[in-house]
Curated annotation (Swiss-Prot):
Gene name tied to this protein: AT2
UniProt keyword tRNA-binding present: no
Main location per the UniProt record: membrane
Any one GO molecular-function label of the UniProt entry: long-chain-alcohol O-fatty-acyltransferase activity
GO cellular component: membrane
Compartments, as annotated in UniProt: Membrane
UniProt similarity note: Belongs to the wax synthase family.
GO biological process assignments: lipid metabolic process
Regions crossing the membrane: 7-27, 36-56, 58-78, 117-137, 148-168, 235-255, 260-280, 292-312
Protein name as annotated: Probable long-chain-alcohol O-fatty-acyltransferase 2
EC id: 2.3.1.75
Disulfide bonds listed in the record: none
UniProt entry tagged with the keyword Membrane: yes
């Protein structure tokens, strides 16, 4: 644990130095290929940073923050595109917007006082559910639950933990920068289509960077060859494939074994089905299913395909057990410190 914390400090210092180089040197180079070439060493550094960790949580978080989001944001920065262009007013803001999954809310709620209490109640309820899951884990979950029941609970765990971590990061950045941030999740369990789930409800920072970095360029490139209609689907498929490859890379950071490409196939499948779904929506003569029916269908599809392609590599390498043990370890450490303070 102490070694991991030392590595954590080293990684964040390395990230700060790297981003300082981008802010003070790369930003002075004219946009385009030359600035992109100046950023190549940073891309490589951010690609290697997660390898300093052995903890699943640190590997995943550093892989998501640096290797995925920061590298894609810097790629866009090379061509003077948002979110790092126009250049923020100081290094602190540039560092935060580059390395954290945050985006300024340009249309803040007109009635924040009314909405805030409800959000706190929802957050408290989610914390309660997450605590219940940890209690289930502590009481020999693996001996009393079927595989399907465990995967369903673990899916809820993944969602809740991801949202709670990113909400905490967003709140911290909001206080530091003095501006309201857009929510990272938008009640994904209410999605009634795959398109809605992936683009408007689940981890919204990912489509925020993949759309300008992958979807739009591929669509523009393919438009003269395929036409605008088909180019849109090509851009969408490319986006899902890139997302799958990035997930595959994060799996490698955690497992340190050659990829099996199951996770990439998961996202490729979802990309194909999402394209079919959009094509069917454009056929006006097809009946629109009820929200309850389509919502249930999407939930079942997500669980079945996740159990088939997303989780097997994780389960074979006992990643789920490492995740659970790390969560329980953190809870025990917090309890000990609270007891020491009270005594």
């Amino acid at each position: 644990m102490e070694e991991e914390l030392r590595n954590l400090i080293k990684v964040w210092i390395s990230a700060l130095i790297s981003i300082s180089y981008c802010y003070y040197i790369s930003s002075k180079i004219s946009k385009g290929v030359l600035r992109l070439l100046s950023l190549l060493p940073i891309f490589i550094i951010f690609l290697l940073l997660p390898l300093f960790f052995s903890s699943v949580h640190f590997c995943v978080i550093s892989g998501f923050f640096f290797t995925w989001l920061a590298n894609f944001k810097l790629f866009l920065f090379a061509f003077d595109q948002e979110p790092l262009s126009p250049l923020p007013s100081n290094l602190t803001r540039f560092f935060c917007f580059a390395c954290f999954p945050i985006k300024i809310n340009k249309n803040p709620s007109s009635n924040r006082i009314h909405n805030k209490p409800m959000s706190k109640w929802v957050l408290a309820f989610k914390l309660l559910i997450f605590s219940f899951l940890l209690h289930v884990y502590r009481n020999n979950y693996d001996s009393g639950l079927s595989r399907f029941a465990f995967l369903a609970l673990f899916t809820i765990h993944v969602y809740l933990e991801a949202e709670l971590i990113l909400v905490f990061v967003g709140a911290l950045m909001s206080m530091l920068l003095g501006c309201e941030m857009e929510p990272v999740f938008n009640d994904p369990y209410l999605a009634t289509s795959l398109q809605e789930f992936w683009s408007r409800r689940w981890n919204l920072m990912v489509p925020a960077v993949l759309r300008p970095a992958v979807h739009i360029p591929v669509q523009r490139f393919c438009a003269p060859l395929l036409g605008l209609h088909r180019a849109f689907y090509a851009g969408m498929l490319a986006t899902f494939i890139v997302s799958g490859l990035m997930h595959e890379l994060i799996y490698f950071y955690v497992i340190r074994k050659s990829p099996t490409w199951e996770v990439t196939c998961f996202f490729l499948l979802h990309g194909v089905v999402t394209c079919l779904e959009i094509a069917m929506k454009r056929m006006r003569w097809l009946p629109t299913p009820r929200r309850a029916v389509s919502g249930l269908a999407i939930t079942v599809f997500l669980l079945v395909t996740a159990g088939w392609l997303f989780y097997p590599q994780m389960l074979r390498n006992d990643v789920h057990k490492r995740v659970i043990s790390e969560c329980l370890l953190v809870i025990d450490v917090v309890k000990r410190h609270v007891v020491c303070i009270l005594m």
